[in-house]
Design a protein with these regions (language model features):
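Flexible, charged surface loops at secondary-structure boundaries
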Residues: 1, 80-83, 174-177, 233-239
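Short hydrophobic/charged patches on amphipathic alpha-helices used for structural packing
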Residues: 74-78, 170-174, 228-232
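Short hydrophobic beta-strand that contains or immediately precedes a catalytic carboxylate
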Residues: 5-7, 125, 181-184, 265-266
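N-terminal accessory regions of nucleic-acid-interacting proteins
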Residues: 140-185, 189, 211, 224-227
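Conserved hydrophobic/aromatic pocket- or pore-lining residues that grip, position, or stack substrates
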Residues: 28, 184, 196
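Active-site-proximal helix-loop-helix substrate-binding element of RNase H-like nuclease domains
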Residues: 120-123, 128-131, 153-164, 191-194, ...
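A polyanion-binding, active-site-adjacent surface
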Residues: 1-154
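Acidic beta-strand-to-loop metal/phosphate-binding motif
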Residues: 84-92, 182, 239-247
């Protein structure tokens, strides 16, 4: 596996011939040692320190067209990385040069296929000025990204079941549900459940949409009642464990529908808080820290025109 580490540009106080300041390099080296990350190449995306990122773009618009010199630097970087497998980018500009994406909080800690370098996967994370100088609490995030950059992401087959009728729900529970499920709901401003998903493994999930964003039901009144009765059927099983992320939220909504799981309840948010109480608790953050997964939270926002379909997946 051929790996590289690319930073945005040399630090403001980096010595001649260096990419980072002495302190930034000390911190980065310690994090690389913790992650056992040993890149074959360490380089920058832009050869000179930049105070304001927008000055590299036409009209100062970040994420738009690069100015000629910045574009030529990007092109040189692309050529240099041909033949590499995985690149860890430290900073938003390095990520942008290889992926075209500029929102680092959205893609940080995930594998992104580069549209510019065939076969290259990019794992973005924060730059040295942040984790070495101002935000020490982001260092575990950087270590996690370094660990992810040691291997390529491999997409695994997944099956998402979309029921056409009530019989499909019972067929799913008979064929796929054992003694444990994980459950998630999405709701609207009227405090109704608009969609939910039930997963039995990382490769098997059932998704049910109840309403669209226009508050229009996707089922007949009789069928919707039967959907809730199916969930109550699952909730009555004392041998069925239910997993949630922030169980209080989901269970509060289920309770309004008289659905009260009688089996064991486990909550990944509370488990992580007990393990690492100082870290963020959102599902997107935890997935980027601990799971080999693609970025997905932004897809829900982009899908609003399609009524947030698959929002609960």
């Amino acid at each position: 596996l051929k790996t590289a580490l690319i930073v945005d540009w040399p630090s403001v106080d980096a010595t001649s011939g260096s990419i980072m300041s002495e302190w930034e390099w000390q911190v980065t080296s310690e994090l690389m040692k913790l992650a056992d990350f040993k890149p074959d190449l360490i380089a920058f995306a832009h050869p000179a320190y930049v105070q304001k990122w927008g000055t590299l773009f036409v009209g100062g618009k970040v994420g738009g067209e690069l100015l000629p010199f910045a574009k030529s630097c990007r092109d040189k970087l692309v050529e240099k990385l041909r033949g590499y497998d995985v690149v860890l980018t430290l900073g938003a500009h390095a990520m942008f040069c290889l992926t075209g994406e500029y929102k680092i909080d959205t893609f940080r800690g995930t594998h992104v296929d580069s549209p510019l370098v065939p076969g290259l996967q990019v794992v973005p994370t924060y730059g040295p000025p942040l984790y070495a100088r101002t935000a020490w609490n982001e260092r575990p995030v950087v270590v996690s990204a370094m660990r992810k950059a040691k291997q390529r992401f491999v997409d695994k087959p997944r099956t998402i079941y979309l029921p056409d009728n009530i019989a499909d729900l019972y067929a799913f529970s008979t064929q796929h549900i054992g003694d444990e499920i994980v459950f998630d709901v999405e709701t609207n401003k009227s405090c109704r459940i608009t969609e939910f998903s039930v997963a039995t493994s990382s490769a098997c999930c059932l998704y049910v949409q109840l309403e669209d964003m226009g508050y229009q039901s996707q089922w007949s009144e009789r069928d919707e009642l039967d959907i809730w009765l199916w969930l109550r059927f699952l909730a009555d099983r004392k041998d069925l464990a239910w997993g949630f992320h922030n169980a209080t939220f989901d269970l509060t909504y289920l309770d309004k529908y008289a659905i009260k799981p009688k089996g064991p309840i486990f909550d990944t948010m509370l488990r992580h808080h007990a393990w690492q109480p100082e870290l963020e608790k959102s599902l997107g953050f935890l997935a980027s820290m601990h799971l080999p997964t693609r970025a997905w939270k932004h897809l829900r926002t982009r899908a609003k025109k399609d009524f947030n379909k698959a929002g609960a997946l």
